[in-house]
Amino acid sequence: MLYSYTEKKRIRKDFGKRSQVLDVPYLLSIQLESFQKFIERDNEGQHGLEAAFRSVFPIQSYSGNAELQYVSYHLGEPVFDVKECQTRGLTFSAPLRVILRLIIRDATTETPIKEQEVYMGEIPLMTENGTFVINGTERVIVSQLHRSPGVFFDSDKGKIHSSGKVLFNARIIPYRGSWLDFEFDQKDHLFVRIDRRRKLPATIILRALQLSTNQILDTFFEKVIFHLNDEHIQMELVPERLRGETASFDIIANGTIYVNKGRRITARHIHQLKIDSIDRINVPREYLVGKIIAIDYIHDNTGEIIVPANIEITLEILDKLGKANFKRIETLFTNDLDHGAYISETLRIDSTRDRLSALVEIYRMMRPGEPPTREAAENLFENIFFSEDRYDLSAVGRMKFNRALLREEIEGSGLLSKSDIIEVMKKLIDIRNGKGEVDDIDHLGNRRVRSVGEMAENQFRIGLVRVERAVKERLSLSDLESLMPQDIINAKPISAAIKEFFGSSQLSQFMDQNNPLSEITHKRRISALGPGGLTRERAGFEVRDVHPTHYGRVCPIETPEGPNIGLINSLSVYAKTNEYGFLETPYRLVHNSVVTEEIHYLSAIEEGNFIIAQANTNLDDKGNFVEELVTCRHKGESGFFSREKVHYMDVSTQQIVSVGASLIPFLEHDDANRALMGANMQRQAVPTLRTDKPLVGTGMERIVAVDSGVTVVAKRGGIVQYVDASRIVINVHSDEMYSGEAGIDIYHMTKYIRSNQNTCISQKPCVTLGELVERGNVLADGPSTDLGELALGQNMRIAFMPWNGYNFEDSMLVSERVVQKDCFTTIHIQELACMSRDTKLGPEEITSDIPNVGEAALCKLDESGIVYIGAEVTSGDILVGKVTPKGETQLTPEEKLLRAIFGEKASDVKDSSLRVPNGYSGTVIDVQIFTRDGVKKDKRTLEIEEMQLQQAKKDLTEERRIFEAALFTRIRHVLGSDITNIDIVKILKLKREDWSQFNIKDNNKYCQLEQLAEQYYELNKVFANKLEEKRRKITQGDDLSPGVLKIVKVYIAVKRQIQPGDKMAGRHGNKGVISKINPIEDMPYDEKGIPVDIVLNPLGVPSRMNIGQILETHLGMAAKGIGDKINKMLKQHKNAEQLRQFIQKAYDIGDQVRQKVNLNLFSDQEILLLAENLKHGMPMATPVFDGAKEKEIKQMLQLAELPVSGQITLFDGRTGEPFERQVTVGYMYMLKLNHLVDDKMHARSTGSYSLVTQQPLGGKAQFGGQRFGEMEVWALEAYGAAYTLQEMLTVKSDDVNGRTKMYKNIVDCNHTMEPAMPESFNVLLKEIRSLGINIELEKN
């Protein structure tokens, strides 16, 4: 395998056996592609903004004499870039401009056409990492898994009716519009509901579709024809129809008895009747009784109906028909087995007789209480299902609809037709008759994914429809000649709809920015909740459960614990959505029992037809199956199939899991419940100050780190020309350069930015000067990455043993070394904001002149009243001094005297400064001031602006210098290498005709020089414009919300070391709280004197069944052992060849591993660099379901000269005695989770009280108290601590007078209390009185 220069720095040993046929796709593509589809011009008009515009335009006036047409749209450039939007609290968006054409049709004059570009609001843009910046915060739009439009056949599984009878139903769900339901009741009548309203007999909708009773019966039933003769009745025989019936008379034909009376008619009888070609048999008169007439029988002469259709035959009716001389009677063919008379019976309970009465009935159901007119009834019915404005099945819906009805074509109209409705009813009746199956609603073929683009398009369309109504009104005005398109369109409704969606929709979520993995997982999340989806309360067990079709599409492991379990899922690693929005997963094609490299993506529906082998099936070198019988999946079931029958094979072993779960090594040895916790807890890991790659990984770490966008990745290959903490400059390879450009790429680092979760985002370069980089190489590490690999935690030396009860119940004993080495030290950045508003009494003022505040409290503020950068602040310190004017109050004589002496100012303002909240402390790292346009800027603001300007100037000058240097180098190629930069500048300033003195004979060179001179002038122009633009942005006033004059934001950074009470976890769901930080000398140590870092409880393993952690510990020990051996060799100054041989030996361990590392291709310098990076441990990759085997782990331990059992003798640090038994010791990757004791620790003496009960509030956010609940009261009762109990229930809780007296007593050093009536007792009295029961308290 070929490695690039940066990849050679540290190669992860891979134990994977299966070849990688398909690379992991770009992990954020679901978001980026969907949004791209939304904003890209689509000439077909199928997707995005174009589709929305075409669906609403053209808009015609009510009279039809004016029309507003849509021509085209384009998106402008955003005013501010992403970083500027984040600092200013703005939305990163682009203006949408649409060209509209107004046509006024006038019979008298020529038709004037006015065309104009109209502004239609701002469209938020997606950043390159798949997020949106809305009001300065990064948000993610989560994709939604909703029920696909189409038709679904279902049953109630016998739950609705007490008899347990299964009632079937069908539901037509459009993409937008009214739902149409058909359902059977317990009497087998078929009903219809529109939008889940009151049910009506289903035949009403058929009558509304202009079908008569005869046509309805014709459509749904076959007919049986009887011929009446004078002496007997003959029936036209279709033998198949007799199957399973009991003969009620002897079946005789041509003198032969085929079936005796009372016998069941079997297949043999039918076969005999067919052979003998019997087409008529005689039947007794009684046989016709109970049969149903199929058509109206009308008197030839009078035209009156003698016998109407759908009537049961009686002997009287037979006589009537005989008298009227009807020789042929048509009846409906029904039976109890597979031809139920459901529609016939429904017709009998249907009170309507014609189309009008059916339409009126539907109108009454949809609009109860309104008087129906013919026109209104017809319009309503037409609009419900047959109007393009109100109803759309969409391409997906039509495809699903036609597939469900087994039609050939899958495209068609978005509206329902008469035949659609009839066929759905027919299929539902077939299912009731026992032919066909109901659909599985949880099958992924019936659920589709709606991503950002589609949801934004729907919102945009809603906004456009609101605009349409207003436009129609305006087009009907008389003075149209004077109007232009922009006077007719008001863009507010569109902006409002878009803003509401991105700002407050349930699926627009505050991005989880704890670490790179949590970002990626959030963007790949799929939720069944949200508008048009399920609700937590109504979602049953089936919807939440893992379904066979989830395989390779949705992760069966990663889902939240709690009420959302199973409703929020994660996309599998290789899954993608197809054009219809259904999830697909890739498979390798198997051709004649040979597995090919050809990849096919299959949706859940397509997959059902194939037999698919698992990814871990053994193949020979040519891709043939080794075993005769192969483990495969078919129609959701697993089993053995012969290799000739296999159609496809899985692409990878990690195909079924999500990104989060694919990062858990030895996942295959963990119980699913613990794996779920492990996958979820990795997302809560806080980025540590010093990152450390996992010794035992899965090989997905690099992919996640690069795709998450937190690292800086080279866009083009080249040589590192300059590198410092804030920028990297790459001199691009000539073959990757565009013509006429300088060939320089500059990458800027992000420094100490606050994330959404208050963690710290900072990037640091991981390349050195002169290094060769290629496209896609990592140039700088971000938070939680180490040399371009995801590094969420730290490798800790752990031992599984009890230690004096300090690791009881999952607690952890941690060594002081971990604190000293800053292993789990994290930086947290808090943002605090102070607003100065314009109040009724005057503006609030930000100042250092605050009434009644001493000098000491103001010592950290500058003269503008704002804290200076670098100040160490603790809770209660003033960050921004602010005074608010207060209304006139009645002054006491003393105050009047003071005002007379000291002037007005002191008492007409009150202190409303921004202070550090309780429990926070840290260092001020940044201050930002935003001033409204037109408000005078204070001194500090001007200083900050000046500083930003100088920085921008410096950066741009430096950038320009770099580009200039590259240009000058190319000019030297033309003019000769001995020319100086000063001369070059002089030459470029000369006129073209003065160049003749340089004797440039070559015309080609002359052209080159001309081109370079052009570039030089262009460069100067571009940088002058950039600087001017920067200056404008820095000095312009800010657009603040109404009434706000100034906003000051202060950022405080705090360094948090690990301490008892912090929550930590491994990657296998093994979580716990630190119980004690132990001195290093007291920790257990091994024979070499190396102490362990963390002691875990061995009882945490067997019951949890997450054995993966033990295997990780062993392999981690081997990885560290090999690193130690390399370190030892480096210390002994062994030469590169010896190092090469030893490292090669480590890479060669393992049977049939896919990774082939040939260190002979590495130079000695590269080997030494590799060894330097491996000396702290050789990182290993053990991919999910394809990981290291026990034998391989033992080989690694042997190479590291460690005991193969993985257990060693430990000694007690306090006594020096060896422990009785050997202990499992090794290296495990531990994470510090974002549940820090500092954020949870809280104490209160006095504070706020609840208004009604007068009891202290609860919770840290409200600065509340600790609840003394009923169980605690029982505890005090049990010990008879009556006075303590009285104090708890009165003065410490809600006895208002008692607690104020208590203050006074404490001040007077009188330690007694006088408890009175608790306020909550008064509340109880009032509640009882509200029930009408009077209670009086008697005082004795």
Swiss-Prot record:
GO terms for biological process: DNA-templated transcription. Gene3D superfamilies: 2.40.50.100, 2.40.50.150, 3.90.1100.10, DNA-directed RNA polymerase, subunit 2, domain 6, RNA polymerase alpha subunit dimerisation domain, RNA polymerase Rpb2, domain 2. It holds the Pfam family RNA_pol_Rpb2_2. It catalyses: RNA(n) + a ribonucleoside 5'-triphosphate = RNA(n+1) + diphosphate. SUPFAM superfamilies: beta and beta-prime subunits of DNA dependent RNA-polymerase. Its EC number is 2.7.7.6. GO terms for cellular component: DNA-directed RNA polymerase complex. One of its GO terms (molecular function) is ribonucleoside binding. Keywords: DNA-directed RNA polymerase, Nucleotidyltransferase, Transcription, Transferase. InterPro entries: DNA-dir_RNA_pol_bsu_external_1, DNA-dir_RNA_pol_su2, DNA-dir_RNAP_su2_dom, DNA-dir_RNAP_su2_hyb_sf, RNA_pol_bsu_bac, RNA_pol_bsu_CS, RNA_pol_bsu_protrusion, RNA_pol_Rpb2_2. The RNAP catalytic core consists of 2 alpha, 1 beta, 1 beta' and 1 omega subunit. When a sigma factor is associated with the core the holoenzyme is formed, which can initiate transcription. DNA-dependent RNA polymerase catalyzes the transcription of DNA into RNA using the four ribonucleoside triphosphates as substrates. Belongs to the RNA polymerase beta chain family. HAMAP family: RNApol_bact_RpoB. NCBIfam families: PRK00405.1, rpoB. This is DNA-directed RNA polymerase subunit beta. It comes from Baumannia cicadellinicola subsp. Homalodisca coagulata. The gene is rpoB.
